[in-house]
Amino acid sequence: MAAPGPGEYFSVGSHVSCLTCLGQRLQGEVVAFDYPSKMLTLKCPSSSGKPNLSDVILINLAYVSEVDIINDRTETPPPLASLNISKLANRARTEKEDKLSQAYAISAGVSIEGQQLFQTIHKTIKDCKWQEKNIIVMDDVVISPPYQVENCKGKEGSALSHIRKIVEKHFRDVESQKTMQRSQAQQTQKDSSLSS
């Protein structure tokens, strides 16, 4: 490994090129370097090809056979961006609530189909929760097992109609996905029988 020796560091903002033990060449701007663990963080052009995005890659220098500094940054790096702590706390709280909701559904014995439907609804309408095996949406609509359109109950109105449309679309999408997977499996089976 041609990594820095004792007392040597990668400067934030420098551009480096690394060759991994798998022969993969990685090139990018140094975002961070932790000397004790020999972990290097690079910001690289996006693998999606989108110009306004970047990939951030963590590299363990123990698994790198070569490191070349392309352009060493000599000036002081720009100050770190400030963090919106309340926004981060809200996101962490929301993620925790989502995970607890998933865990509740699993422990309550809710079917995979019910869990998937809950996730689909939750993407659009955050105000949904579990009540035993029932999905409660906006405290107005109850969806009971087996979670089909006809299992949506509530007072007639736009909320019930909207939820029924989401449920209907969810199962339509699931069915079209299954059909596509079956046709791909049949094509693969057909291709393998032709090659034998």
From Swiss-Prot:
Residues 3-73 form the Sm domain. Residues 81-175 form the AD domain. Residues 177-196 have a biased composition (Polar residues). Belongs to the LSM12 family. One of its GO terms (molecular function) is RNA binding. InterPro entries: AD, Lsm12-like, LSM12_ABD, LSM12_LSM, Sm. This is Protein LSM12 homolog A.
